[in-house]
Swiss-Prot record:
Location of this chain's protein in the cell: Cytoplasm
Physiological role: Involved in the regulation of the intracellular balance of NAD and NADP, and is a key enzyme in the biosynthesis of NADP. Catalyzes specifically the phosphorylation on 2'-hydroxyl of the adenosine moiety of NAD to yield NADP.
Pfam families for the chain: NAD_kinase_C
Family classification: Belongs to the NAD kinase family.
Cofactor: a divalent metal cation
Gene, per the UniProt record: nadK2
EC category: transferase
Full protein name: NAD kinase 2
Xref: NCBIfam families: PRK03501.1, PRK04885.1
GO molecular function, one term: NAD+ kinase activity
EC number of this enzyme: 2.7.1.23
Top-rank taxon: Bacteria
Enzymatic reactions: NAD(+) + ATP = ADP + NADP(+) + H(+)
Gene3D superfamilies: Probable inorganic polyphosphate/atp-NAD kinase, domain 1, Probable inorganic polyphosphate/atp-NAD kinase, domain 2
Amino acid sequence: MTDQRRNVYFFHKQDQETNEQARSLTQLAEEHGFTVVNQHSDANIIASIGGDGTFLQAVRKTNFRDDCLYVGITKKGKAHLYCDFHSDEREKMVDAMTFEQIEVRKYPLIEVTVDQASPFHCLNEVSIRSSIIKTFVMDVLIDDLHFETFRGDGMIISTPTGSTAYNKSVAGAVVDPLLPCMQVSELASLNNNTYRTLGSPFVLSSDRKLTLRVVQDGNEHPIIGLDNEALSTRNVKTIEIKLSNKKIKTVKLKDNSFWEKVKRTFL
């Protein structure tokens, strides 16, 4: 698997501690026949040094490439869902690569189109929230058919791997990443005798399209979060969300499954 992939790009924060770890990892990579490159466009392996947040940034800043492998390396021995390697476990990294103790997982992306502009991609989730202290109103359509009119603080639409992040904090379900789907979770929905929403998360298959039409009532400048970045505030009328045909490939240890990571992180 790695025989044809020898060009490595390290993505990391520019602080003294991380720079030292990057230099150490660069030396390790070069000792084992890899070439460390300065531009991510020249790489076929992109390794992030940090936590899950750094991994998300690495994927976004390198344009969600589907022609390379992404590797998560954490700086400290804490549990991370996207990072299978620790920077202080050099021998384990070498053994994993040498003896093929790794496998490649393909993770789906969410594709977000705002008012028919160029689409954005997300690995974890897209969130749409009110930017002012006022109930946010959206018409929710599934495959262009009206499903409900949402009133509340906003919504989160997550991938299976993203289901353990923001989505879980609002009582969304944790979804197996082998299921190609996206989950829709509400933020403080308004439910009474006059207004009604489903009131629970729901899951859409990879063939479905979700459309959110923002009611133009003075609250049409929502905060749109794309993973751990915010989209510039703008007047928004329609947001279309679907599971992208594009996927990223990540390297994971064979003995470190998604559910083992979930158990280690939350239980």
